């Protein structure tokens, strides 16, 4: 149950006081799993603004001799850069009293990095840990997935990884009991349900859970599956209804495609605040979180595509066991592919909207400077540049669309959806969530040609799709395209108050008049430009005391690519879905 409490500053005295509440956690477990009792309290200031998360937990002792206590806090790198969202006011105690900790050090673990605090002595009995993590900067200099701890609509939002500091036994399953404390009239919802929850979880599964806590608005669209519900912080009622209504219809389509029971709970979480102009999403088990900038147009087809993309992640099995980002060709490629084809098949996009989305995908692939690098290489550099991250998404989607067309050309009764569902089924039955399972499905159900095509894609060979790719209503044709190139080195992100440097002599930026030392005065979302074959970029700058607008085509050179068009005159009316 939820525990109402007075709204107040949660200070260090309050944290220490929690160590006196042993009775609350006086449960004895007879099995080998350790009990982990967590209490979460959103911290608010005198103005009732959420400023951080207070965490207190009690961990029962291990029955197996341990090498020593170490607590790990994910740095969120390389996709994010922590700012103010650091561990503060950390206090650890056991049966013998306070446990002193050595200064934290950063350690790498596979593709992730952690701050690690180590105890200076062996611990004894139940372990009590308490600390506070303040909210992150609303507009960080490096914006990756929306998993960081953010204030929105008078509450808190993010993923549990944004604030959890847990023992270093990442694979150990704990018997978790999680409790929320907040004022009456407020609530918390996570990937695991509304309010408190219990279950068996390891650190990785806890980290991945998404949440909203505070004055959360709820909405259940009529006519949808009984398990589908929408929750939001910071979003006006009308906007909430608009985005929820389309999402509910898309969810029904995707749920059926991926064979998810109508009664299975599904939680669509939304956080809206002034955190930059780019809408974004993050998925978890049977849930996903959408970030919307304040005042965002919720009727945009690009938003619908994003929502459909994130739901795909949460309804099928990704290649989560792949090293680093090497599974993103599948994990993100399937999400991009099905977020276009499934809603279109259900009539949720018009023919013109579908065409625009397909050409956006094509531009992200064919105009990408990294388009010829291997999947392994792209995984290592996808967070290094402006549109580098787009490559595994777009290349994976183009590959899957090509595969679907070739299945029809080979007179197969199977579709890519059938192959993906077969892959998910094998993973659910214990197969590794890696390329091996996908290639096993291709070998068993399709044939050598499909394995060859897959290997060519993984090697970075250019994909020029077969006729019928993306359906019969669209026709693809080869064309010459320019490589996306802003023409200057810094800043990587085109953000307000950043100074331009490294303008390339002779580039389109140089020819348009952009100069080293110019100060950008407005943040620009480059994603729609990188997802276009010909959109110009317009950069407002200040040179000395003079404001100026620099406009140019951010592309260079000419290479072979493909674009799509409607199959005949009047196709928007003739193309059935």
Where are these regions (language model features)?
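Glycine/proline-rich low-complexity spacer/linker segments in large multi-domain proteins
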Residues: 133-172
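Beta/coil-rich, acidic/histidine-enriched accessory regions frequently appended to metallopeptidases
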Residues: 27-42, 51-58, 86, 426-577
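Acidic/His/Gly-enriched intrinsically disordered linker/tail segments
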Residues: 325-397
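Short, well-ordered beta-strand segments enriched in hydrophobic/aromatic residues
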Residues: 38-40, 50-69, 90, 247
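A surface-exposed beta-strand-loop module
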Residues: 79-146
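N-terminal signal peptide c-region/cleavage motif recognized by signal peptidases
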Residues: 20-21
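Zn2+-dependent metallopeptidase catalytic core
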Residues: 83-92, 161-167, 173-193, 202-208, ...
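Juxtacatalytic substrate-recognition/specificity segment
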Residues: 218-327
């Amino acid at each position: 149950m939820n525990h109402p409490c007075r709204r107040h500053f949660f200070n260090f005295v309050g944290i220490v006081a929690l160590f006196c509440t042993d009775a609350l956690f006086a449960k004895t477990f007879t099995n080998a799993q350790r009990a982990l009792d967590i209490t979460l309290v959103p911290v608010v200031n005198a103005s009732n603004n959420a400023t951080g998360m207070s965490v207190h937990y009690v961990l029962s002792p291990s029955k197996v001799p341990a090498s020593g206590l170490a607590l790990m806090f994910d740095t969120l790198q390389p996709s994010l850069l922590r700012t103010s969202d650091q561990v503060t006011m950390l206090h650890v105690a056991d049966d013998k009293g306070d446990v002193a900790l050595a200064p934290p050090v950063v350690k790498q673990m596979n593709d992730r990095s952690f701050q690690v605090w180590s105890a200076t002595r062996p611990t004894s009995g139940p372990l009590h840990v308490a600390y506070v993590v303040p909210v992150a900067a609303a507009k960080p200099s490096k914006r990756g997935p929306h998993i960081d701890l953010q204030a929105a609509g008078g509450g808190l939002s993010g993923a549990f990884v944004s604030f959890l500091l847990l023992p270093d036994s990442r694979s150990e399953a704990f018997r978790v009991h999680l409790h929320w404390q907040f004022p009456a009239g407020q609530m918390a919802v996570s990937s695991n349900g509304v309010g408190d929850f219990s279950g068996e979880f390891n650190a990785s599964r806890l980290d991945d859970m998404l949440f909203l806590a505070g004055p959360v608005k709820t909405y259940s669209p009529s006519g949808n599956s009984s398990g589908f519900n929408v929750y939001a912080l910071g979003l006006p009622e009308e906007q909430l209804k608009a985005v929820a209504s389309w999402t509910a219809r898309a969810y029904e389509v995707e749920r059926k495609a991926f064979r998810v029971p109508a009664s299975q709970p599904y939680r669509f979480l939304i956080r809206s605040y002034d955190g930059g102009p780019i809408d974004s999403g993050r998925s978890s088990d049977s849930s996903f979180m959408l970030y919307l900038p304040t005042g965002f147009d919720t009727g945009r087809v690009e938003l619908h595509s994003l929502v459909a993309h994130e739901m795909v992640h949460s309804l099928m099995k990704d290649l989560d066991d792949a090293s680093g980002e090497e599974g993103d060709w599948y994990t993100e490629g399937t999400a991009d592919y099905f977020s276009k084809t499934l809603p279109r098949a259900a009539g949720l996009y018009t023919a013109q909207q579908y065409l625009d989305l397909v050409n956006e995908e094509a531009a992200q692939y064919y105009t990408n400077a990294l388009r010829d690098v291997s999947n392994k290489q792209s995984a290592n550099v996808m967070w290094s540049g402006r549109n580098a991250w787009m490559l595994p998404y777009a290349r994976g989607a183009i590959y899957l669309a090509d595969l679907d067309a070739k299945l029809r050309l080979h007179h197969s009764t199977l579709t890519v959806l059938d192959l993906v569902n077969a892959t998910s089924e094998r993973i659910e039955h214990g197969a590794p969530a890696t390329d091996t399972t996908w290639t096993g499905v291709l070998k068993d159900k399709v044939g050598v040609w499909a394995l060859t095509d897959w290997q060519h894609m993984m090697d970075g060979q250019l994909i020029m799709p077969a006729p019928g790719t993306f359906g019969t209503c669209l026709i693809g044709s080869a064309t010459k395209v320019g490589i996306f190139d802003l023409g200057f080195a810094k800043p990587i992100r085109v953000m307000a108050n950043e100074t331009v440097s490294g303008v390339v002599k002779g580039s389109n930026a140089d020819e348009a008049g952009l100069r080293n030392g110019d100060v950008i005065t407005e943040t620009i979302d480059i994603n729609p430009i990188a997802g276009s074959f010909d959109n110009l970029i317009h950069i407002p700058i200040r040179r000395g005391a003079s404001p100026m607008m620099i406009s140019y085509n951010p592309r260079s050179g000419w290479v072979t690519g493909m674009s799509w068009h409607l199959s005949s005159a009047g196709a928007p009316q003739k193309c059935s879905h």
